[in-house]
């Protein structure tokens, strides 16, 4: 089932320096909660400055949904320590609140109680909140409070030059973009390994269903927790953050221009379903527009091609201008065993897997095959640890045992690990391979199995509150290592100044401005 990567691995072993200079970054979302686990109703903590313009700490859907962002970094330890500093400072500046350590929320009874993220009075800030109003009216606020970790990854130019020859200008844009689309296609085919290993949402609180019927064969505990005994990541299931209306958009990952055309089409395609919501009600705007996507960011995807945007530039226009610059991996649940929601083992695994995806052959993928890859993902998401579970290749009928496929993949990853260790020194990547490959013979070692044992004992609420309390105490006591207190104060002041400048620079009323941007 795994493509034959032996030639590509032999090439890599002859060109180890091609992997020197991998760049990465992390984004981590987490809900602010009270000591009893209920959602905080306070505004964004003052010490964190402006959520609109702060470089490192912002908000996602809700005012209580924090998002931490590291700068691009070539050093894993430095990146994780930077992320930990963001958590340390925040833990000291959020009063008695703490950070919810799980992907799935628990103590939220009614979606309407969730305050949307607020970004001030600038047109840009009001637009961001209106986008979230549209998300709430389309999918419900509760679904939008699900948290995850995003891992951003780019290969060094040395890799592309070693692989594609001496490239520059338009040639580099085309070839590097084609290389990243290869990564994306392989990710769709084999990325289910991420929820298998690191999925940490095998259960939900009964309040999350809000009384809606479900076809999933949940087991229920006395405290009202619903779980699937072999599930890995209900966050990635249809219960979680998915958009069924997007499944027939036909967006593919074979070619830059084809992908961008599909994305641009989606933000222009009217939706009958969303038209029923309306645009305005009693003078209040309900969504940006009633198209399938309000804006490009609404496209649900487990992985995205990205380029840093310039001011006023859409993500797709940035891709057209310069091609793909990096990849955003979006399938990581919050790691409940880490105070910062992610750990070194995961980052090193993702490095290995991304390199493997760049090396392995990846035939073009039609939208129908893309849909077929979802079958494997769904199996792993809902019953990944089930004995005897098999997976297929694309739309073909042949089936292969998941543990065997996993071990075959790790045989390749071990060779990538040896190459990365040879240029970085030590055996850190090989150690990660040895630790994780054991999960295929013993699924009890996976994150989902480990957290489910705790949840069955104490419920999701009990588990979440215990971790949240422990991490709050730990982070509040730890000294900062990279950033200093004055760095945070300076960024708070600078972010507030940037927001004020944006608000002062606006000359058009929001309604007029919106007509140009909707």
From Swiss-Prot:
GO MF annotation list: ATP binding; glutamate-cysteine ligase activity; metal ion binding
A single GO cellular-component term on record: cytosol
InterPro entries: Gln_synth/guanido_kin_cat_dom, Glu_cys_ligase, Glut_cys_ligase
Pathway, per record: Sulfur metabolism; glutathione biosynthesis; glutathione from L-cysteine and L-glutamate: step 1/2
Pfam families (alphabetical): Glu_cys_ligase
GO BP: any one term: glutathione biosynthetic process
Swiss-Prot/TrEMBL catalytic activity: L-cysteine + L-glutamate + ATP = gamma-L-glutamyl-L-cysteine + ADP + phosphate + H(+)
Enzyme class: ligase
Keywords from the UniProt entry: ATP-binding, Glutathione biosynthesis, Ligase, Nucleotide-binding
Enzyme Commission number(s) from the entry: 6.3.2.2
UniProt superkingdom: Bacteria
SUPFAM superfamilies with a match to the protein in the record: Glutamine synthetase/guanido kinase
This protein's record includes keyword Lyase: no
The keyword Ligase is annotated on this UniProt entry: yes
Gene3D superfamilies noted in UniProt: 3.30.590.20
PANTHER family cross-referenced by the UniProt entry: GLUTAMATE--CYSTEINE LIGASE (PTHR38761:SF1)
Similarity annotation: Belongs to the glutamate--cysteine ligase type 1 family. Type 1 subfamily.
Name this polypeptide is given: Glutamate--cysteine ligase
Source species taxonomy: Bacteria, Pseudomonadati, Pseudomonadota, Gammaproteobacteria, Enterobacterales
Gene name of the record: gshA
């Amino acid at each position: 089932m795994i493509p034959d990567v032996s030639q590509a691995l032999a090439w890599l072993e002859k060109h180890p320096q091609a992997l020197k200079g991998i760049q990465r970054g992390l984004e981590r979302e987490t809900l602010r909660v009270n000591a009893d686990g209920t959602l905080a109703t306070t505004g964004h903590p003052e010490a964190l400055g402006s959520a609109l313009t702060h470089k490192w700490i912002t908000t996602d859907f809700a005012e209580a949904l924090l998002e931490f962002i590291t700068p691009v970094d070539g050093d894993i330890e430095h990146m994780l320590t930077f992320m930990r500093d963001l958590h340390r400072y925040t833990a000291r500046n959020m009063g008695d609140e703490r950070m919810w350590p799980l992907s799935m929320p628990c103590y939220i009874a009614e979606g309407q109680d969730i305050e949307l993220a607020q970004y001030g009075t600038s047109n840009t800030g009001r637009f961001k909140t209106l986008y979230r109003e549209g998300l709430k009216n389309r999918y419900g606020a509760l679904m939008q409070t699900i948290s995850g970790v995003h891992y951003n990854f780019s290969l060094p130019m040395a890799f592309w030059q070693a692989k594609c020859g001496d490239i520059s200008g338009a040639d580099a844009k085309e070839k590097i973009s084609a290389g990243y689309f290869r990564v994306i296609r392989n990710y769709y085919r084999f990325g289910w390994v991420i929820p298998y290993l690191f999925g940490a949402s095998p259960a939900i609180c009964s309040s999350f269903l809000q009384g809606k019927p479900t076809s999933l064969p949940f087991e229920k505990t006395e405290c009202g927790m619903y779980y699937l005994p072999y599930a890995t990541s209900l966050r990635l299931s249809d219960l979680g953050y998915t958009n069924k209306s997007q499944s027939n958009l036909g967006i593919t990952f074979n070619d830059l221009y084809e992908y961008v055309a599909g994305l641009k089409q989606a933000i222009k395609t009217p939706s009958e379903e969303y038209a029923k919501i309306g645009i305005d009600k009693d003078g209040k705007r309900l969504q940006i527009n009633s198209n399938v996507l309000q804006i490009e960011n609404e496209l649900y995807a487990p992985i995205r091609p990205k380029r840093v945007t310039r001011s006023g530039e859409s993500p797709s226009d940035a891709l057209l201008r310069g091609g793909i610059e990096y990849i955003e991996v979006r399938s990581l649940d919050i790691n409940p065993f880490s105070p910062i929601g992610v750990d070194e083992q995961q980052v090193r695994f993702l490095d290995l897997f991304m390199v493997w995806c760049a090396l392995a052959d990846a035939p073009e993928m039609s939208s129908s095959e893309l849909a077929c890859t979802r079958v494997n993902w769904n199996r792993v998401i809902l019953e990944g640890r089930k004995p005897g579970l098999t997976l297929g290749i694309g739309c073909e009928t042949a089936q292969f045992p998941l543990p065997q496929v996993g071990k075959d993949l790790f045989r390749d990853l071990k060779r990538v690990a040896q190459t990365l260790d040879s240029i970085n020194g030590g055996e850190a990547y090989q150690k990660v391979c040895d630790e994780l490959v054991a999960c295929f013979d013993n699924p009890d070692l996976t994150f989902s199995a480990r957290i489910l044992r705790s949840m069955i004992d104490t419920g999701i609420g009990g588990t979440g509150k215990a971790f949240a309390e422990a991490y709050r105490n730990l982070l509040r006591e730890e000294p900062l290592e990279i950033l200093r207190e004055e760095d945070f104060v300076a960024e708070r002041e600078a972010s507030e100044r940037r927001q004020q400048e944006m608000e002062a620079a606006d000359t058009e009323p929001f309604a007029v401005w919106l007509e140009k941007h909707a």
